[in-house]
UniProtKB/Swiss-Prot annotation:
Protein's name according to its UniProt entry: ATP-dependent RNA helicase MRH4, mitochondrial
Disulfide bonds listed in the record: none
Comment on protein domains: The Q motif is unique to and characteristic of the DEAD box family of RNA helicases and controls ATP binding and hydrolysis.
Family stated for the protein in its record: Belongs to the DEAD box helicase family. MRH4 subfamily.
Source organism of the structure: Debaryomyces hansenii (strain ATCC 36239 / CBS 767 / BCRC 21394 / JCM 1990 / NBRC 0083 / IGC 2968)
């Protein structure tokens, strides 16, 4: 006897005393007309009581979440429901950054930086001062977990009637010391464009400021000496120099953001003796005053050593740059600045932990012997990434996983359309299909008065320039409007080319090129983490190779709850029947597998 319940096909075995339902598949399959059809659905619903032939009853199990999973589009790991539920409950109860444990001046600087990057176009808000910034789900979940005190009630008075033996006191002191210094590993996974950067920056900067305040309140001289030490306190690792620039710019703006203590910090905090003394320092009156250093493409090792003559609070770089120090045969102890790093963030971890990067990334991590917090942050959790972490840290309880309920789901505010190049008038030409899509976007009446920016993704870098040339020569696009980028371009050229796409859209009359539409053609090189400010349209010229790539490409639009459109162009070779089900998958909120 076979039933189909809620999209799951279970096998039902009628035994003497019980009914056993064994799930066979939790995947959603989209079949072509020629594929075999399933048997008609039974009327049983999840949670319904089923009566057996012998009169025994058993409640039907609730169905597991459906997945959109096919072939190479099945490489994503699905977190346990319990983990998502825990995160969901916390998210429901918190609606303000004031409810989160963030150092007061860090909170103020963070809000100013978030407002700076907010796109007011197409909103009713006239100025950024009117914005009410609320934490996103991933920010709530991550800040709560990472900023939890390592020791609770450390300063509470002992309530034991009898004085403890000296041996017991020594043991407790050792246990406290171990707890304060042991390595804690966090993974942060949330949908693209959800605010993950500040999900790890807020705890990181808070810990740095709290440590400064602790040292200052112990001894002003110790605090002054600590600021002169030649060390790096924290490191943020990123896969590309574009991302290094992006994260560094956010940190620099936050570090230099103007802070009005009276206006932005709670009066109770200002009256707290430990905060009052530290915040009264002139250096804390107007900004975070943190030393943030970028070590990017083209920067010599000497730049790092020069910056390290005074304490570096945050270093933003790539794993390859740090590992490059090993080649300096004429420099004594080239890694000496990293001996006291206490906090390390591996951003875009699904990339930095794949086979192309893992050797450099893990080599850097191994050098951080004093690290207390190691944070892996990503928009996806590939199965291979989870296996790699399991090998690195065999004790599963040593890893604290932080996920959001919408992980691996394409945001519903993204409108995805599949265009079949086999149909008339394209007649099998994907390039003609692309040209028509660009024309339609240009004339659709949206973003009036602004230069429209469009991202086009292809799978191979060898296709970038030929496609750009075809759009210019055959379809009449201006050369200054079609921009192609590959890994062959040096980092400075890439930054110059993508600048119009990273900043808010310009008014038509202010664009120096006189452009009405700008098109950026690239590969997955630029699909990871970059915040393309206010981009409304993304075109996938080629079907991505995996669901990981699909999530990242689509995630260049629809960021921070803003709307976006994605056009997927298919032909006879890539026009699988299941790909046409993607729009429904998004509308129904089904995660990718």
């Amino acid at each position: 006897m076979t039933l189909k319940i809620g999209g799951i096909v279970p096998i039902v075995r009628v035994m003497r005393d019980t009914i056993i339902q064994r799930p066979v598949s939790t995947f959603v399959r989209y079949h072509s007309k020629r594929s075999r059809s399933f048997k008609k659905k039974a009327n049983h619903k999840p949670g319904q009581v089923i009566r057996s032939k012998l009169g025994k009853t058993l409640e039907a199990p609730k169905t597991q979440p459906k997945l959109f999973s096919f072939g190479n589009f099945s490489g994503l790991d699905q977190p346990e429901n319990k983990l998502k539920e825990m995160s969901s409950n916390a998210i429901k109860n918190i609606t303000s950054f004031e409810s989160l444990r963030i150092f007061p001046t860090v909170r103020s600087a963070m809000l100013e930086e978030i407002k700076y990057g907010y796109n007011l176009k197409s909103t009713y808000i006239k100025s950024k001062e009117e914005l009410e910034i609320k934490p996103s789900p991933v920010q709530i979940a991550a800040i709560r977990k990472i900023n939890q005190p390592r020791l609770r009630n450390v300063n509470a008075e002992k309530k034991l009637a009898d004085k403890k033996a000296s041996g017991q006191e020594i043991l407790e002191d050792l246990q406290k010391s171990n707890e304060m210094n042991r390595l804690k590993i966090f993974t942060i996974a949330a949908e693209t464009g959800s605010g993950k950067t500040w999900a790890y920056l807020a705890p990181l900067l808070s810990k740095l400021k709290e440590e400064d305040m602790r040292v200052f309140n112990m001894s002003e001289q110790s605090y002054a000496d600590a600021k002169k030490t030649s060390i790096i306190r924290s490191v943020i690792l990123l896969p590309t120099h574009e991302l290094v620039e992006q994260v560094y710019d956010s940190l620099k703006r936050a570090s230099k953001a103007s802070i009005d203590l009276e206006a932005s910090v709670n009066k109770k905090i200002l009256q707290d003796p430990q905060y009052a003394r530290y915040l009264s320092l002139p250096e804390n009156q107007t900004s975070l005053n943190l030393n943030v250093v970028k070590w990017g493409s083209g920067d010599s090792h000497q730049k790092l050593f020069d910056a390290g003559r005074k304490r570096i609070d945050v270093l933003v770089t790539t794993p390859a740059k740090i590992q490059g120090l090993a080649k300096l045969n004429n420099v004594s102890r080239p890694f000496r600045l990293f001996n006291f790093v206490e906090y390390c963030v591996v951003d875009e971890a699904d990339t930095l932990m794949d086979k192309s990067w893992i050797v450099d990334t893990t080599s850097v991590i191994r050098r951080l012997s004093k690290c207390k917090d190691l944070i892996f942050c990503s928009a996806t959790i590939p199965k291979e990434f989870k296996k790699t972490l399991g090998k690195m840290f065999p004790d599963e309880f040593s890893i604290i996983n932080i996920v959001t309920p919408s992980l691996h789901k394409i945001p519903k505010q993204i409108n995805l359309k599949v265009i079949d190049a086999q149909l008339s008038p394209y007649n099998g030409s994907k390039t003609r299909c692309l040209a028509q899509a660009l024309y339609a976007i240009h004339n659709d009446g949206t973003e009036q008065g602004y230069v429209k920016r469009i991202l086009v993704f292809v799978n191979e870098k060898r296709d970038v320039q030929p496609l750009a040339d075809t759009l210019i020569e055959k379809f009449g696009h201006r050369e200054e409007d079609i921009i192609g980028i590959t890994g062959a371009d040096n980092a400075d050229d890439r930054l110059a080319k993508i600048e119009p796409f990273l900043k808010p859209a310009e008014l038509l009359e202010e664009d120096l090129d006189g452009s009405k539409v700008k098109v950026l053609i690239t590969t997955d090189l630029l699909a990871r983490g970059l915040n393309f400010n206010g981009i409304k349209n993304v075109i996938l010229m080629d079907l991505p190779n995996t669901s990981v790539d699909l999530v990242h490409r689509v995630g260049r639009t629809g960021r921070m709850r803003q709307s976006g459109r994605v056009f997927v162009i298919i032909d006879k070779k890539t026009g699988k029947s299941w790909i046409k089900g993607l729009p429904k998958v998004i509308k129904k909120g089904i995660p990718l597998g």
